[in-house]
Regions:
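Domain-level signal for soluble alpha/beta catalytic cores
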Residues: 1-394
Length: 394
């Protein structure tokens, strides 16, 4: 399916994305043997819970789930590859099978999509290659006693993402989907890897990006505001940006409004089925969720709508009627000024006049700082650095 057709449809109507994969896998009540199959019968360690492996050992289950979402009205469905990267697969000592899993996932999804479109000539279906954030962060230390330590490097992430994207593209996906992004540095490595792979393979696939926010303050888990995040990825070639996971649809609207106002991209939203209960499951009914999603559609905030944790084909089945005849979101214009990002956005406009970034912590630019360093007065020098940090745009 070509990129031009996808973009044309985004301008014409609101597209429907599928719902939760893990939720549906749980409904099959699979055991350890299901995850192992004959191929991995003697593989050391427990494999139950490695859902991505089911693309090899129980492809029938994964294809059944994909078809259920298509029957519910989904225009786009994601491959079962959220954790299919070498970094995450290390938990199961299955790094060597990453390419095979992604290739199998792409191929079985391609088969489902092509078969379904042959059976339903009036439907256009897109396969999105799902790429999760990995289980490590490049921006923060997992050790509070060693804040400079990083459990993963940018190069590690780039290599892991590159291998995954290669498998998905070779498997026949239509879209590259980075989802549940919580660390900007992680996804920047992924976006770079994706663009390199697509260039090497001479493919022009659309790239979608979806992030997750903290319920407290609406920031990414690495601390950025939405606008700072947009500034951080403005150099990339994504076609859409959006929100998924995080919380339920009831709490997502103000952040979608901010994206819709400022993001020069198409907008996606696929919230959880409410918030998890004390047992870790989700109780929001399909009708209740549709009620919360309705304003996204009516106010022109989205181009793509779907579901994340706790959602099922029953939830997605409410969307076709909801989006029928609705006008899709029109992307905002690109910023007319310089956008810089830290934890918050810095807009550099003519009316800002001169923006003084600071030279007080430079031995070549500050005699006082030079003297303190020469004298070994590091605590006083650190005080200057702290004052600059407090005054700086975050």
């Amino acid at each position: 399916m070509n990129k031009e057709r996808f973009l044309r449809l985004l301008n014409e109507r609101i597209l429907i994305l599928d719902g939760g994969m893990g939720t549906m896998i749980q409904s099959f009540k699979l055991n350890e043997q299901d995850y192992r199959g004959e191929r991995f019968a003697d593989f050391p360690g427990q494999l139950k819970g490695n859902n991505d492996l089911l693309c090899i050992t129980r492809p029938d289950v994964i294809q059944s789930i994909h078809r259920q979402y298509l029957d519910a009205g989904a225009d786009i469905f994601a491959t079962n590859t959220f954790n299919a990267n070498a970094i995450s697969m290390a938990d199961y000592a299955m790094e060597a099978y990453v390419r095979e899993i992604n290739l199998a996932a792409g191929r079985l999804s391609r088969e489902v999509a092509d078969t379904y479109m042959a059976e339903h000539p009036d439907r256009t279906i897109f396969v999105a290659g799902s790429i999760g954030p990995t289980n490590k962060t490049a921006s923060m230390s997992p050790d509070v006693s060693d804040p400079a330590y990083r459990a993963v490097t940018y190069k590690d992430l780039y290599n892991a993402y590159k291998e995954q994207v290669e498998g998905l593209v070779d498997g026949g996906v239509d879209i590259i989907l980075f989802e549940t992004t919580f660390d900007t540095l992680n996804v920047k490595a992924g976006l770079e890897a994706a663009e390199v792979v697509l260039k090497e393979k001479e493919k022009d696939l659309p790239i979608m990006l979806s992030l997750t926010l903290s319920a407290q303050g609406g920031r990414t888990f690495s601390g950025q505001t939405l606008l700072a995040f947009l500034a951080s990825i403005q150099h990339t070639h994504i076609v859409s940006v959006g929100l998924n996971c995080s919380f339920g649809a009831a709490d997502m609207k103000p952040y979608l409004q901010e994206l819709a106002k400022y993001a020069p991209y198409y907008i996606s939203a696929y919230p959880n089925a409410g918030l998890p209960n004390s047992f870790g499951t989700y109780d929001e009914t399909p009708d209740k969720m549709a009620q919360h999603v309705k304003p996204f559609v009516e106010e022109g905030l989205v181009n793509i709508i779907g579901g994340c944790c706790g959602t099922t084909p029953a939830h997605i089945s409410r969307y076709p009627e909801l989006v029928k005849g609705a006008k899709p979101h029109i992307p905002a214009l690109k910023p007319d000024c310089l956008w810089l990002s830290g934890l918050e956005l810095l807009e550099v406009k003519p009316e800002n006049n001169f923006v003084n970034v600071g030279e007080r912590c430079n031995v070549a630019g500050s005699r006082k700082f030079l003297r303190l360093i020469k004298e070994g007065s590091y605590e006083e020098a650190l005080t200057i650095a702290r004052s600059k940090w407090r005054m700086a745009p975050k």
